[in-house]
Amino acid sequence: MASSSRSVLLLVAALFAVFLGSAHGIAKVPPGPNITATYGDEWLDAKSTWYGKPTGAGPKDNGGACGYKDVDKPPFSGMTGCGNTPIFKDGRGCGSCFEIKCTKPESCSGEPVTVHITDDNEEPIAPYHFDLSGHAFGSMAKKGEEQKLRSAGELELKFRRVKCKYPDGTKPTFHVEKGSNPNYLALLVKYIDGDGDVVAVDIKEKGKDKWIELKESWGAVWRVDTPDKLTGPFTVRYTTEGGTKGEAEDVIPEGWKADTAYEAK
């Protein structure tokens, strides 16, 4: 969307918020336009809060609405957060990456840091709202002033979408979810370089030509129900929001097991 169009939409959202605040006493700010993979490198305004432990990764179970596990550990390493509707996008924003920075209060470093979207938030406090892990929120501070910044509670920040760059050796990973069986397969897709988020997933059994389309289940989880037993090995094909396709050949082996993660070769 062009910059001028985005500005008009944000102005309308702000005016509508004022109306709601006058009518009901509480300003419920409508969300801004969706931030897509083709959005560009323009810095936008947002509000930021934080949740969980001060130096933690957010959720108590180190998970979140995307379905990822252990977001406190590499490669996410606690640099995570919840996005509101135009960022989380009903799960299609899971895995996307954003640079964020703050300049006020004085404890802000002004230097950008990168966060991954791993969770959802519904607080209508701004067109764009990042509810960050305590660790990610503190990372915007000058060295040694992390807790001072966290004590601010809520900040104005600048953000922009960027390509995800995982550490060397990180491979696309497909977690076969609990409850999967030969007639039902659910895959959690994670660690996708580039766009980070995924909009389509298909599988193909070894020796067959037909691709089987998976449907969105929730968060970053994709599923398929089939009357024919799925035995594997499977190649997984995924498409990112920007249209990039990737294939992980025979990544799900014959004799696959539920609640098990398989890395691309």
From Swiss-Prot:
Plastid listed as a keyword: no
Occurrences of domain Expansin-like CBD (ranges): 183-264
GO-annotated cellular components: extracellular region
SUPFAM superfamilies: Barwin-like endoglucanases (SSF50685), PHL pollen allergen (SSF49590)
Biological processes per GO annotation: plant-type cell wall loosening; sexual reproduction
Pfam families the UniProt entry points to: DPBB_1 (PF03330), Expansin_C (PF01357)
Carbohydrate-modified residues: 34
Highest taxon listed in the record's lineage: Eukaryota
CDD domains with a match to the protein in the record: DPBB_EXPB_N
Transmembrane stretches, start-end: none
Compartments where located: Secreted
Ranges for domain Expansin-like EG45: 63-169
Family annotation (SMART domains): DPBB_1
Secretion signal span: 1-25
Main location: secreted
Alphabetical keyword list: Allergen, Glycoprotein, Secreted, Signal
Protein family according to the UniProt entry: Belongs to the expansin family. Expansin B subfamily.
Protein name: Major pollen allergen Hol l 1
